Curated annotation (Swiss-Prot):
Coiled coil: none annotated. S-adenosyl-L-methionine binds at residues 160, 181, 203, 245. Belongs to the methyltransferase superfamily. PrmA family. Keywords: Cytoplasm, Methyltransferase, S-adenosyl-L-methionine, Transferase. NCBIfam families: prmA. This is Ribosomal protein L11 methyltransferase.
Length: 308
């Protein structure tokens, strides 16, 4: 089967938004080539081999989307271009935006990359395991089964990794967790496996909602509820922890709303914040929260705060 490969060159800041647009347009797969991710993974012991050419590229991110050849494929590509350019109106830097389109065979991308994706340990005991890989838990490790590439959130991106490390420290046995913009469901699944009592996960993107449901089922979890919601609009009740791994503009918008959905002294974990906008986000967060800790990795930061 032939597929259309759409290669978008953009910035780290725009990476997540571009990926989400691709999924919303029905991409059969999305692959992100990020030099910083390669450097991060190289620090672990989960790789048998790392090609030196992977370290030669610096700067821009390349995001590849794969669409089946159909009568509306050209229209989808044009919509993709328009929506990426539109990101500038939301204050997102798309950099030297470039799009290349080519035709590829399914075998060139659908399965070959899997041999290089290995179980990844994050924090003290979290292990992200691709669904096709065999792995035996060591000691107190908790295994998160995931089919990467279907929606944002595989554990390799700095924003997701920092959230997982924070969750390992803050989730308690009686915790109720709200995951806003859940993507693949990785943060919700991890919260449940860390012992949370109830977890509610939502995304505005129907593809992400379906993917998160599949991953929850893959992990045999009964206490994680996944649904469609525009940010917090469909959430009910109050949580001990609200996590949002989104983008700076949305974190700023959410900051005034999150306290209404948090219990007294509840925690707000915000990630997906590019370093260049950290101070802007902090200024808004500090209006409603006491900032407890800030973590930085690569070009990104995550903020843990407590309701005032």
């Amino acid at each position: 089967m032939k597929w259309i490969e759409v290669q978008v060159t953009t910035t780290q800041e725009a990476e997540e938004a571009v990926t989400n647009i691709m999924h919303e347009l029905g991409a059969g797969g999305v692959v992100i080539k990020n030099p910083n991710d390669v450097k991060l993974l190289a620090q672990s012991d989960n790789w048998d081999y790392l090609d030196s050419s992977l370290f030669e590229e610096e700067g821009n991110i390349k995001v590849f989307a794969y669409f089946p050849i159909a009568s509306d494929t050209t229209d989808k590509i044009n919509i993709l271009k328009d929506r990426i350019v539109e990101l500038k109106s939301f204050g997102i830097d798309i950099g030297n935006f470039d799009v290349k389109v080519s035709e590829v065979d399914e075998a060139d991308w659908e399965n070959n990359w899997k041999q290089y994706y290995k179980p990844l340990k994050i924090g003290k005991k979290i292990v992200i395991k691709p669904s096709w890989e065999e792995y035996v838990s060591q000691g107190e490790e908790i295994i998160i089964e995931l089919d990467p590439g279907m929606a944002f959130g595989t554990g390799t991106h700095e924003t997701t990794k920092m959230c997982l490390e924070f969750l390992e420290d803050i989730v308690m046995p009686e915790s109720i967790v709200f995951d806003v913009g859940c993507g693949s469901g990785i943060l919700s699944i991890t919260s449940s496996k860390l012992g949370a009592k109830e977890v509610y996960a939502a995304d505005i993107d129907e593809v992400s909602v379906e993917v998160a449901r599949q991953n929850v089922e893959l992990n045999n979890l009964q206490n994680v509820k996944v649904f469609k919601s525009d940010l917090l609009s469909e959430f009910r009740g109050k949580a001990d922890i609200i996590v949002a791994n989104i983008i700076a503009d949305v974190i700023i918008k959410l900051s005034a709303e999150v306290p209404k959905y948090l219990k007294e002294e509840g925690l707000f974990l915000a990630s997906g914040i590019i370093k260049s906008r950290k101070e802007e986000v902090l200024q808004k967060v500090e209006e409603f929260f006491e900032v407890l800790q800030i973590r930085e990795e690569g070009e990104w930061c995550a903020i843990l705060s407590r309701k005032k």
